Amino acid sequence: AHAKEMGAKPLTSPRFFLKPWAALAEPPMGCEMMLPRHLDEVHHEVELVLRLGEDATLTEIAVGLDMTDRATQDEAKAEGMPWTQSKGFANSAIVGNFIEPPVGLAHLRLELAVNGEPRQEASIGQMLFTPLDLLSSLSQWAPLEKGDLLFCGTPSGIGPLARGDHVQ
């Protein structure tokens, strides 16, 4: 749904991008997060996050925020360039508390509200590619290591954040 929302063609196979470890933030609940001052328009994208164990197996899951510098990403897309600069800034990979995954992930829901207003909501079962399909595809493309994180994509409803917004 997010790809359609962004005007992209539906994918027949997953696409991936990288975020540097320095982009990772694992803040305690209720804390304030600082966005880089030089960014004009940062969008929220709520996602399921997988943490990998030995042999690239799924060991834990969490809710995450993939923060995107939308203007820079749009420029990169138009020029056919990588998205690293738009996705890899400080605090652009915010991850909540990890838990042991339940049996089956399809019934889990992702929800995000900004200042109490619902913005994103969908079940994992509505994803174009299942989390395990993403993991399988990525493991064929790149070497995966214990501790690696895989953000699994976002539902429709992404949008900009303003300084002082409260995200739940």
What are these regions (language model features)?
Residues A1-E145, L149, G157-Q168:
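Catalytic-core "active-site belt" of small-molecule-metabolizing enzymes
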